[in-house]
C-alpha cells in the first residue's frame, strides 16, 4: 500500500500541465464554433436544415484550419473589436491557441450549428464544438475530449462577440483512468449553495484513490497560467463537495481530479452564476 501511495504522489507533477490544458479549453473551443462569410438575407430561423451552404462550408474550413493548428487562418474571421464573455481578446486567444496546439499537435475539431437567427445586419448562432486529441509525448500522454456550446454574433463576415453557454472537458492518462460521473448544476444564483459530486463508477478493488476539487473564476489570465493542485487520499469512491456561489455573477471552472495507481481523470465543467 505504501508503494502505491508513493507512486501516486510521484505523478502529481503532471497535474499542473493537465489543469493548465483544461483552463485553456474555452480559448481553443472558440476557434471554430461558428463562422459566417457574408450577410444572409433571410427571415429568423431556428431550423438548422435551413442553414445557408455558405455557413456550413465556412464552418468546415475553420474546423480544418483549427485542426491543422493554423492560428492566423482562424483569427482572420474575428473582428478587430472582438469581445468575449471571458475577457479574451484576439491577442490572448492567439497565444492560448498556439500554446495548446504545441501540446496537442494532433487535435481535431468538429462543429455543428444548433440554431441561428437574423438580428438586423447581424447573425446570432448557437453551436456545439467537439474537440479531441489522442495521447502524445508532447502532452504527457494525455487524451482530451471536450464539448463546448457557445453563442456567436457575426457582423459583416466576422465574429464580433462570443459567449460560452456550457462546456465539459475530460482529460485522461494511464492504462486504466477512472470512469468518473460528475454531477454539477449548469447554473446557480449568487450566494446559492450547490452540490458537486465526482463519483468513480467502476469497482476499485485494492486500488487507492487520490483526488481534489477545484473552483476557479474564469478570467482571461487563467487561460495561459497553469494551476497546481494538492491531492488528498480519498476514503470513499469519489469526491462529494458542497459549494457556495460567489456574491457576484460570473462563470466558474469546477474541476474534479481523480487518480488511481494506473490512471488519472480530470473533469472540468463550467458553472454559470447569475443574479437572483
Region spans (language model):
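Short acidic/polar inter-strand loop motif in beta-rich domains
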Residues: 133-135, 259-268
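Short, low-complexity N-terminal intrinsically disordered segments enriched in polar/charged residues
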Residues: 32-64, 68
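Short beta-strand edge/turn micro-motifs at domain boundaries
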Residues: 140-178
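Short, well-ordered alpha-helical segments enriched in acidic and aromatic residues
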Residues: 67-92
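Short, aromatic- and glycine-rich surface loops/edge beta-strands on solvent-exposed regions
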Residues: 198, 242-262
Amino acid at each position: 500500500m505504501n508503494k502505491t501511495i508513493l507512486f501516486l504522489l510521484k505523478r502529481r507533477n503532471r497535474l499542473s500541465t493537465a489543469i493548465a490544458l483544461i483552463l485553456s479549453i474555452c480559448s481553443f473551443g472558440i476557434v471554430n464554433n461558428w463562422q459566417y462569410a457574408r450577410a444572409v438575407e433571410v427571415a429568423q430561423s431556428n431550423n438548422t436544415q435551413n442553414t445557408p451552404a455558405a455557413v456550413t462550408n465556412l464552418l468546415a474550413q475553420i474546423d480544418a484550419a483549427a485542426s491543422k493548428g493554423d492560428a492566423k487562418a482562424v483569427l482572420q474571421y474575428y473582428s478587430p473589436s472582438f469581445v468575449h464573455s471571458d475577457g479574451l481578446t484576439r491577442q490572448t486567444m492567439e497565444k492560448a491557441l498556439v500554446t495548446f496546439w504545441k501540446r496537442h499537435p494532433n487535435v481535431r475539431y468538429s462543429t455543428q450549428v444548433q440554431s441561428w437567427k437574423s438580428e438586423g445586419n447581424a447573425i446570432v448562432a448557437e453551436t456545439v464544438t467537439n474537440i479531441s486529441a489522442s495521447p502524445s509525448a508532447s502532452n504527457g500522454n494525455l487524451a482530451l475530449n471536450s464539448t463546448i456550446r457557445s453563442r456567436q454574433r457575426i457582423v459583416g463576415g466576422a465574429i464580433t462577440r462570443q459567449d460560452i453557454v456550457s462546456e465539459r472537458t475530460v482529460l485522461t492518462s494511464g492504462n486504466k483512468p477512472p470512469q468518473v460521473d460528475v454531477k454539477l448544476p449548469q447554473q446557480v444564483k449568487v450566494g446559492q449553495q450547490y452540490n458537486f459530486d465526482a463519483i468513480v463508477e467502476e469497482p476499485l478493488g485494492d486500488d487507492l484513490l487520490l483526488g481534489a476539487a477545484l473552483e476557479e473564476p474564469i478570467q482571461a489570465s487563467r487561460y495561459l497560467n497553469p494551476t497546481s493542485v494538492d491531492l488528498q487520499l480519498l476514503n470513499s469512491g469519489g469526491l462529494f463537495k458542497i459549494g457556495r456561489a460567489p456574491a457576484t455573477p460570473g462563470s466558474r471552472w469546477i474541476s474534479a481530479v481523480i487518480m488511481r495507481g494506473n490512471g488519472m481523470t480530470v473533469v472540468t465543467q463550467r458553472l454559470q452564476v447569475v443574479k437572483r
